[in-house]
Regions:
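N-terminal pre-domain/capping segments
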Residues: 1-93
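Active-site acidic/histidine proton-transfer and metal-coordination neighborhood
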Residues: 84-181
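Conserved small/polar residues in nucleotide/adenosyl-binding loops
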Residues: 241-248
Length: 250
C-alpha cells in the first residue's frame, strides 16, 4: 500500500477534526473549563517538548480529551547540517507522550554550518534542494513512524538558482516521499502579493489529496510588501479552503 494512500486514509480518519486552534498559555484556564466548537489543538514543539510545570500538565490533560497535533519550527528540513540529535530526541519524547495524529514543520531551514538562526530561512527551489529535502523528509518519516506534513512558507526574495516554482517543488516532494501538506493560506497570499503570482493557481497546482491541515493567520502591510507576522486578523479564508476540499483540518 502506497504512502500516498496512507495520507488519504489519514484525512478520512480525522475528517471530523475540522476546526482547531493553537494552544497558548493565556487560554489555559478557559480551555480546561470547556472548549465548545474546537475539534483539536496544535502545540508548537519547541514551546512544549522540554517544558514542565503547568504547561506540561495542561497539555497532558487536554491530550486525554482532544487530538493534539505537533507543529515544529526548528527541524531545519532544508538545512545543510545533519539533524540535531538532541532536538530529535526531545521531539520524539513529546510525540510519544501526547500521541499526535500527525506532526509538521516548515519547508525552510534554521540551522547551517553550525549556526542556529532561530528563524525560518527560505532556500532556492532547485533540483539539488529537492533531493536534499526528500532525503530528510524520508528520514523523519522513518524515524518517527507517523504521518508528517510539510508547510509552505513565506519568503521575501526570489532566488536566481531556483529551478522550480514552490508549488511544483511541493508537488514533487509529495510524490517522492508520501508526506502530507500543511497549507498556510496566509503564506500563499503574502507570497502571491510580494512576488506577483496568482494565489488560486498556486493552490490549484497542489495535490488536494495531500492537504491534511490548513493554517490561517494574519500579516502586516509595510506599504511596499506584506510580512507574515501572525500579528493581525486573518483575511477571508473561505474561498481558499473550499478549493482544497472540506476534509482538511483548519
Amino acid at each position: 500500500m502506497s504512502e500516498k494512500t496512507s495520507i488519504e486514509r489519514l484525512r478520512e480518519r480525522h475528517r471530523s477534526a475540522r476546526h482547531g486552534i493553537g494552544l497558548r498559555r493565556p487560554h489555559f484556564d478557559a480551555l480546561l473549563e470547556g472548549a465548545p466548537g474546537i475539534d483539536f489543538f496544535e502545540v508548537i514543539a519547541e514551546n512544549t517538548m522540554t517544558i514542565g510545570g503547568r504547561t506540561r500538565a495542561v497539555v497532558d490533560a487536554l491530550a486525554e480529551r482532544f487530538p493534539i497535533v505537533v507543529h515544529g519550527v526548528n527541524l531545519s528540513l532544508a538545512g545543510p547540517d545533519p539533524f540535531a540529535g538532541e532536538y530529535l530526541d526531545a521531539l520524539e519524547g513529546l510525540i510519544e507522550r501526547i500521541d499526535p495524529p500527525w506532526f509538521s514543520d516548515h519547508l525552510t531551514y534554521s540551522r547551517a554550518f553550525g549556526v542556529e538562526y532561530h528563524d525560518l530561512i527560505p532556500f532556492p527551489f532547485s533540483r539539488a534542494g529537492l533531493d536534499r529535502v526528500t532525503e530528510r523528509v524520508l528520514y523523519v518519516k522513518e524515524r518517527f513512524g507517523r504521518p508528517f506534513l510539510v508547510e509552505n512558507s513565506s519568503y521575501y526574495a526570489a532566488f536566481p538558482a531556483a529551478e522550480l516554482s514552490e508549488a511544483r517543488f511541493l508537488c514533487e516532494l509529495v510524490e517522492r516521499t508520501g508526506c502530507g501538506l500543511l497549507l498556510d493560506v496566509n503564506n500563499v497570499y503574502v507570497n502571491a502579493v510580494n512576488h506577483g503570482y496568482d494565489p488560486y493557481e498556486f493552490i490549484d497546482t497542489l495535490p488536494a489529496r495531500a492537504v491534511v491541515q490548513i493554517h490561517m493567520a494574519g500579516h502586516d502591510d509595510s506599504g511596499t510588501f506584506l510580512v507574515d507576522t501572525h500579528g493581525a486578523r486573518a483575511i477571508e479564508p473561505r474561498s481558499e479552503e473550499r478549493r482544497v476540499g472540506k476534509e482538511c483540518a483548519t
